[in-house]
Amino acid sequence: MEAGRPDSITREKLEVLKRHKIPRISINPQTMQQKTLDLIGRKHTVGDILRVYGMARELEFENINMDLIAGLPGETVEDVKDTLRQIEELSPDSITVHSLAVKRASRLAQMPELKEAALQEERGRQMEAMIDLAAESAARMGMKPYYLYRQKNIAGNFENVGYAKVDKAGIYNILIMEEKQSIVAVGAGASTKAVFSAAEDQLKNGQPGKEVKLEKRIERVENVKDVGQYIARIDEMIERKGELLWH
Protein backbone atom coordinates (compact mmCIF):
# COMPACT_ATOMS: atom_id res chain seq x y z
CA MET A 1 0.00 0.00 0.00
CA GLU A 2 1.14 3.53 -0.73
CA ALA A 3 1.59 5.02 2.71
CA GLY A 4 1.60 8.46 1.11
CA ARG A 5 4.11 11.24 0.71
CA PRO A 6 6.35 11.59 3.76
CA ASP A 7 4.76 14.90 4.77
CA SER A 8 1.31 13.29 4.92
CA ILE A 9 2.23 10.13 6.87
CA THR A 10 1.42 10.14 10.57
CA ARG A 11 1.92 7.60 13.32
CA GLU A 12 -1.86 7.26 13.56
CA LYS A 13 -2.13 6.30 9.87
CA LEU A 14 0.68 3.77 10.20
CA GLU A 15 -0.97 2.26 13.27
CA VAL A 16 -4.22 1.84 11.31
CA LEU A 17 -2.33 0.05 8.51
CA LYS A 18 -0.55 -2.16 11.01
CA ARG A 19 -3.79 -2.98 12.82
CA HIS A 20 -5.34 -4.10 9.54
CA LYS A 21 -2.32 -6.30 8.79
CA ILE A 22 -1.10 -4.43 5.70
CA PRO A 23 2.13 -6.34 4.96
CA ARG A 24 3.91 -3.95 2.57
CA ILE A 25 4.00 -0.15 2.47
CA SER A 26 5.72 2.37 0.22
CA ILE A 27 7.42 5.47 1.62
CA ASN A 28 8.58 7.46 -1.36
CA PRO A 29 11.38 10.02 -1.03
CA GLN A 30 12.03 10.40 -4.81
CA THR A 31 15.41 11.88 -3.83
CA MET A 32 17.37 12.61 -0.66
CA GLN A 33 18.52 16.01 -1.98
CA GLN A 34 16.62 18.83 -0.29
CA LYS A 35 17.41 21.35 -3.03
CA THR A 36 15.74 19.05 -5.56
CA LEU A 37 12.67 18.47 -3.42
CA ASP A 38 12.27 22.24 -3.13
CA LEU A 39 12.75 22.75 -6.88
CA ILE A 40 10.14 20.20 -7.95
CA GLY A 41 7.60 21.43 -5.43
CA ARG A 42 7.55 18.52 -2.99
CA LYS A 43 6.39 19.59 0.45
CA HIS A 44 8.36 17.04 2.45
CA THR A 45 11.94 17.32 3.69
CA VAL A 46 14.73 14.78 3.93
CA GLY A 47 14.13 14.92 7.68
CA ASP A 48 10.49 13.90 7.12
CA ILE A 49 11.65 10.85 5.17
CA LEU A 50 14.02 9.73 7.92
CA ARG A 51 11.43 10.36 10.64
CA VAL A 52 8.63 8.46 8.90
CA TYR A 53 10.86 5.55 7.92
CA GLY A 54 12.09 5.23 11.51
CA MET A 55 8.50 5.37 12.76
CA ALA A 56 7.47 2.55 10.39
CA ARG A 57 10.34 0.36 11.59
CA GLU A 58 9.42 1.08 15.21
CA LEU A 59 5.93 -0.22 14.43
CA GLU A 60 7.59 -3.35 13.01
CA PHE A 61 6.67 -2.99 9.36
CA GLU A 62 8.84 -5.68 7.79
CA ASN A 63 8.38 -4.89 4.11
CA ILE A 64 9.03 -1.26 3.17
CA ASN A 65 9.50 -0.05 -0.39
CA MET A 66 11.04 3.30 -1.36
CA ASP A 67 10.63 4.99 -4.75
CA LEU A 68 13.45 6.99 -6.33
CA ILE A 69 13.56 9.02 -9.54
CA ALA A 70 16.59 9.21 -11.82
CA GLY A 71 17.01 12.35 -13.91
CA LEU A 72 15.35 14.94 -11.70
CA PRO A 73 16.13 18.52 -12.79
CA GLY A 74 19.40 19.90 -11.50
CA GLU A 75 20.61 16.61 -10.07
CA THR A 76 24.07 15.34 -10.91
CA VAL A 77 25.45 11.82 -10.83
CA GLU A 78 27.11 12.74 -7.53
CA ASP A 79 23.74 13.79 -6.10
CA VAL A 80 22.31 10.40 -7.01
CA LYS A 81 25.30 8.67 -5.42
CA ASP A 82 24.60 10.55 -2.20
CA THR A 83 20.89 9.67 -2.33
CA LEU A 84 21.72 6.00 -2.81
CA ARG A 85 24.21 6.11 0.05
CA GLN A 86 21.50 7.40 2.38
CA ILE A 87 19.01 4.81 1.15
CA GLU A 88 21.53 2.03 1.75
CA GLU A 89 21.92 3.23 5.34
CA LEU A 90 18.16 2.88 5.80
CA SER A 91 18.16 -0.55 4.10
CA PRO A 92 14.58 -0.78 2.83
CA ASP A 93 13.26 -4.15 1.67
CA SER A 94 12.73 -3.01 -1.90
CA ILE A 95 13.24 0.03 -4.09
CA THR A 96 11.62 1.14 -7.32
CA VAL A 97 13.85 3.25 -9.54
CA HIS A 98 11.83 5.45 -11.89
CA SER A 99 13.26 7.22 -14.91
CA LEU A 100 11.97 10.78 -15.02
CA ALA A 101 8.66 11.06 -16.86
CA VAL A 102 7.29 14.58 -17.30
CA LYS A 103 3.58 14.38 -16.50
CA ARG A 104 1.24 17.06 -17.81
CA ALA A 105 -0.07 18.05 -14.39
CA SER A 106 3.33 18.16 -12.71
CA ARG A 107 5.12 21.32 -11.67
CA LEU A 108 8.00 20.35 -13.97
CA ALA A 109 5.70 20.40 -17.01
CA GLN A 110 4.92 24.05 -16.23
CA MET A 111 8.63 24.97 -16.29
CA PRO A 112 9.68 24.69 -19.97
CA GLU A 113 13.36 25.40 -19.37
CA LEU A 114 13.67 22.54 -16.87
CA LYS A 115 11.55 20.20 -18.96
CA GLU A 116 13.75 20.81 -22.01
CA ALA A 117 16.94 20.28 -20.01
CA ALA A 118 15.59 17.01 -18.63
CA LEU A 119 15.05 15.63 -22.12
CA GLN A 120 18.38 16.59 -23.71
CA GLU A 121 20.67 13.90 -25.15
CA GLU A 122 23.48 14.62 -22.69
CA ARG A 123 20.99 14.30 -19.88
CA GLY A 124 20.11 10.88 -21.24
CA ARG A 125 23.71 9.76 -20.82
CA GLN A 126 23.75 11.03 -17.26
CA MET A 127 20.52 9.20 -16.55
CA GLU A 128 22.01 5.98 -17.83
CA ALA A 129 24.86 6.38 -15.34
CA MET A 130 22.35 7.11 -12.56
CA ILE A 131 20.31 4.02 -13.39
CA ASP A 132 23.45 1.87 -13.41
CA LEU A 133 24.42 3.25 -10.00
CA ALA A 134 20.96 2.38 -8.67
CA ALA A 135 21.29 -1.19 -9.92
CA GLU A 136 24.67 -1.51 -8.20
CA SER A 137 23.25 -0.05 -4.99
CA ALA A 138 20.31 -2.48 -5.06
CA ALA A 139 22.73 -5.39 -5.46
CA ARG A 140 24.74 -4.22 -2.44
CA MET A 141 21.52 -4.25 -0.42
CA GLY A 142 20.87 -7.84 -1.47
CA MET A 143 18.13 -6.99 -3.96
CA LYS A 144 17.42 -8.37 -7.41
CA PRO A 145 15.28 -6.85 -10.19
CA TYR A 146 11.81 -8.40 -10.39
CA TYR A 147 9.70 -6.15 -12.61
CA LEU A 148 10.12 -3.51 -15.29
CA TYR A 149 7.79 -1.19 -17.15
CA ARG A 150 7.79 1.90 -19.31
CA GLN A 151 5.45 4.86 -19.41
CA LYS A 152 4.80 7.88 -21.59
CA ASN A 153 7.23 10.79 -21.76
CA ILE A 154 10.17 9.03 -20.10
CA ALA A 155 13.40 10.91 -20.66
CA GLY A 156 15.98 8.94 -22.63
CA ASN A 157 13.49 6.15 -23.39
CA PHE A 158 14.54 4.35 -20.23
CA GLU A 159 12.32 2.31 -17.92
CA ASN A 160 11.22 1.89 -14.32
CA VAL A 161 12.66 -1.09 -12.45
CA GLY A 162 11.66 -2.68 -9.16
CA TYR A 163 14.31 -4.36 -6.99
CA ALA A 164 13.60 -6.46 -3.91
CA LYS A 165 15.24 -8.62 -1.29
CA VAL A 166 14.34 -12.32 -1.08
CA ASP A 167 10.59 -12.82 -0.41
CA LYS A 168 9.97 -9.05 -0.41
CA ALA A 169 8.83 -8.51 -4.00
CA GLY A 170 5.53 -6.74 -4.57
CA ILE A 171 3.66 -9.42 -6.53
CA TYR A 172 0.85 -6.91 -7.03
CA ASN A 173 3.20 -4.89 -9.23
CA ILE A 174 3.72 -7.85 -11.55
CA LEU A 175 0.00 -8.59 -11.75
CA ILE A 176 -0.73 -4.96 -12.61
CA MET A 177 1.82 -4.95 -15.43
CA GLU A 178 0.29 -8.15 -16.82
CA GLU A 179 -3.26 -6.71 -16.54
CA LYS A 180 -4.31 -9.61 -14.31
CA GLN A 181 -5.30 -7.75 -11.16
CA SER A 182 -8.54 -5.98 -10.35
CA ILE A 183 -8.19 -2.76 -8.36
CA VAL A 184 -10.69 -1.16 -6.01
CA ALA A 185 -9.75 2.53 -5.88
CA VAL A 186 -10.87 4.96 -3.18
CA GLY A 187 -10.65 8.74 -3.34
CA ALA A 188 -11.28 11.63 -5.70
CA GLY A 189 -9.97 10.97 -9.20
CA ALA A 190 -9.19 7.31 -8.48
CA SER A 191 -9.85 4.64 -11.10
CA THR A 192 -11.29 1.23 -10.23
CA LYS A 193 -10.40 -1.55 -12.66
CA ALA A 194 -12.06 -4.95 -12.97
CA VAL A 195 -10.36 -7.79 -14.85
CA PHE A 196 -12.78 -10.53 -15.92
CA SER A 197 -11.75 -13.89 -17.33
CA ALA A 198 -13.87 -15.67 -19.95
CA ALA A 199 -14.92 -18.20 -17.30
CA GLU A 200 -16.13 -15.42 -15.00
CA ASP A 201 -18.14 -13.90 -17.85
CA GLN A 202 -19.77 -17.28 -18.53
CA LEU A 203 -20.84 -17.65 -14.91
CA LYS A 204 -22.04 -14.05 -14.79
CA ASN A 205 -24.19 -14.62 -17.88
CA GLY A 206 -25.51 -17.99 -16.68
CA GLN A 207 -23.66 -20.01 -19.34
CA PRO A 208 -21.13 -22.16 -17.44
CA GLY A 209 -19.47 -24.84 -19.53
CA LYS A 210 -20.22 -23.20 -22.86
CA GLU A 211 -17.21 -23.21 -25.17
CA VAL A 212 -15.95 -19.71 -25.81
CA LYS A 213 -12.67 -18.21 -26.89
CA LEU A 214 -10.69 -17.55 -23.70
CA GLU A 215 -10.33 -13.79 -23.55
CA LYS A 216 -10.14 -11.48 -20.61
CA ARG A 217 -12.17 -8.30 -20.43
CA ILE A 218 -11.18 -5.13 -18.59
CA GLU A 219 -13.61 -2.44 -17.46
CA ARG A 220 -13.01 0.73 -15.46
CA VAL A 221 -15.04 3.08 -13.29
CA GLU A 222 -13.66 6.54 -12.56
CA ASN A 223 -14.35 8.57 -9.44
CA VAL A 224 -15.05 12.27 -9.98
CA LYS A 225 -11.92 14.40 -9.56
CA ASP A 226 -13.37 17.29 -7.58
CA VAL A 227 -13.07 16.55 -3.85
CA GLY A 228 -16.30 18.37 -2.98
CA GLN A 229 -18.22 16.48 -5.65
CA TYR A 230 -16.66 13.20 -4.53
CA ILE A 231 -17.83 13.73 -0.95
CA ALA A 232 -21.30 14.84 -2.04
CA ARG A 233 -21.69 11.87 -4.40
CA ILE A 234 -19.94 9.20 -2.33
CA ASP A 235 -22.96 6.84 -2.37
CA GLU A 236 -23.06 7.05 -6.16
CA MET A 237 -19.34 6.28 -6.38
CA ILE A 238 -19.78 3.20 -4.17
CA GLU A 239 -22.80 2.01 -6.15
CA ARG A 240 -20.96 2.31 -9.47
CA LYS A 241 -18.11 0.17 -8.14
CA GLY A 242 -20.58 -2.38 -6.83
CA GLU A 243 -22.33 -2.67 -10.18
CA LEU A 244 -19.00 -3.28 -11.89
CA LEU A 245 -17.47 -5.72 -9.42
CA TRP A 246 -20.27 -7.63 -7.73
CA HIS A 247 -23.42 -7.56 -9.89
Question: Where are each of the predicted segments found?
Answer:
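Conserved non-cysteine loop/helix-boundary elements of the Radical SAM core domain that shape
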Residues: 1-134
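Detector for Asparagine
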Residues: 28, 63-65, 153, 157-160, ...
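Generic domain-boundary/flexible-linker signal
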Residues: 36, 77, 106, 157, ...
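Residue-level signature of transmembrane alpha-helix interfaces in integral membrane proteins
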Residues: 44, 83, 87, 114, ...
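A general marker of short, structured functional hotspots
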Residues: 49, 94, 142-145, 226
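Glycine-rich beta-alpha junction loops
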Residues: 101, 152, 190
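A C-terminal junction/extension of Radical SAM enzymes
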Residues: 105-186
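Radical SAM enzyme core and accessory elements
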Residues: 162-247
